[in-house]
Amino acid sequence: MADQRFDIDAFERRSREGPCFVCLIADGDANQRADNEVIFEDDEVLVFLDRYPTVEGYVLVCPRRHVEHVTGDFSEDEYVALQRWVHRVGEALRRSVPTERLYVLSLGSQQGNRHVHWHVVAQPPGLAYREQQLGLLAKSIRGVLPFDPARNKGLAKRIRANLTVI
């Protein structure tokens, strides 16, 4: 289990009522960037650490422009280009933290967190079966790791270094 309770009610309020957190990061919002360590960005893609990770090695890969549907808002070429980044990030993550299995999924909702993003999550070795799969991602049940900017900077640096060797 992670160390800190996750306030799902506050998260839901921010997700439903607040501005798009991905767009804030893409636009350079200092507060969002302080909370979500950016690993890589260019004109098309944004890669950063999840602010509320359940395990070390929880990364989000997003298109830079605001799109809300995994297939309907992308051309096939745009979609494939983003999936290349998901693959690269997954490989860099596996080289950066102990990983028994890598999870890749798109989560979000038209009711909140609408900006398409892929969760790329390293499942640490040795977790009990019931703590794997959706159990690993259930922040409101599992809890989250305490926010630690120094740890995040170090992890982002390792992932970034491993991205360059791919």
Which residues are covered by each model-predicted region?
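HIT superfamily nucleotide-processing domains
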Residues: 1-166
